[in-house]
Each structure stands twice: as C-alpha cells, then as structure tokens.
C-alpha cells in the first residue's frame, strides 16, 4: 500500500480526532425509516447506504466494481437522502469528497467480540498517490453512556488501545 497521500496534520499524533458533538436535533425516523440491506461486515449489523459507488442501494467497496475505483466520488441515493436530510447535511457540511456513506446499526456486543471483529480498513487501496487520504467519520445516533469505540495500532497489543466514548 502506498502512503503518498495528503493527510491532515491534526491526525499526526494519534491517527484520529474526536469531533465536537452534533448539537442539532435529528429525528430518529431519519435512520429508522431508511432502506437497510442484507450486507454483513462484522458483528450484528445492518447497513443503510446514503451514498454508494453508482447511487444504488448497496454497500460494496468501490474497488469491487468493474472497473474498480477509489472509495471517493460517491453518488447520493435520492430515495435515502429524502428520508435522512439532516444526516446527509451533517456529512455534506464537512466539505469533503464523500465515497461510501452508510448508516450502520451495530448491536451492542462484548469487548471480546469487539476485538474479534476488529480489522484494519483498506479504504485507500485504489486512491491515487497525491490525493487526500480517505477517512472515516463515525457519529453515534443513539445515547448509550457505556458505548465506546476500541482503536488499536496493533490488534494483538492491548498497550496500543484507545477507547473513545461515543455519546449521542
């Protein structure tokens, strides 16, 4: 994998940044009424795409298409955007090129399951050198004070672990 991509200086120290909580109300109907697809990643999940490679209701990485392409220039799915305008605006407000954009309903799981399902994403596999590094943004939609994301630089080394609280 090439590392000749533009990166943000704010990511240099830890590789991640915690954004401010979103202070605007979001009607739960925006994520509850979306069309979810039967597509599995890890854990007990459901996925509702808002943007995909070609604007279809599917969740594949953009590199799975013929021809394969970088995980950028996603096409908003009109029927989903109409249901979730506030969520879409939250994404668009970042001002970045959006690739896959999905609502992921992940059921609570154990710490052991979280580690078992951990994986290193390879979202830059088709990203041309000299372009911006593909990033992921996570936004917790429901309030669970015990919810957190586990990040590890080395999946086998607990000393590299960071836990990020996920307030709604």
What are these regions (language model features)?
Residues 90-168:
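Catalytic core of non-heme Fe(II) oxygenases with the double-stranded beta-helix
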Residues 1-102:
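Non-heme Fe(II)/2-oxoglutarate
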């Amino acid at each position: 994998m090439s590392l000749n991509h533009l990166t943000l200086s704010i990511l240099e120290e830890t590789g991640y940044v915690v954004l401010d909580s979103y202070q605007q109300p979001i009607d739960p109907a925006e994520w509850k009424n979306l069309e979810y697809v039967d597509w599995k990643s890890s854990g007990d999940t459901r996925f509702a795409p808002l943007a995909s490679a070609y604007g279809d209701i599917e969740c594949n990485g953009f590199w799975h298409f013929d021809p394969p392409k970088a995980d950028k220039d996603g096409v908003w799915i009109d029927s989903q955007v109409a249901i979730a305008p506030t969520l879409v605006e939250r994404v668009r407000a970042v001002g970045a090129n959006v690739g896959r954009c999905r609502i992921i309903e992940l059921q609570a799981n154990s710490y052991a399951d979280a580690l078992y399902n951990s994986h290193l994403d390879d979202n830059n596999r088709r990203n041309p050198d000299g372009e911006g590094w593909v990033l992921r943004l996570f936004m917790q939609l429901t309030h669970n004070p015990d919810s957190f994301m586990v990040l590890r630089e080395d999946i086998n080394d607990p000393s590299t672990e960071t836990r990020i609280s996920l307030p709604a």
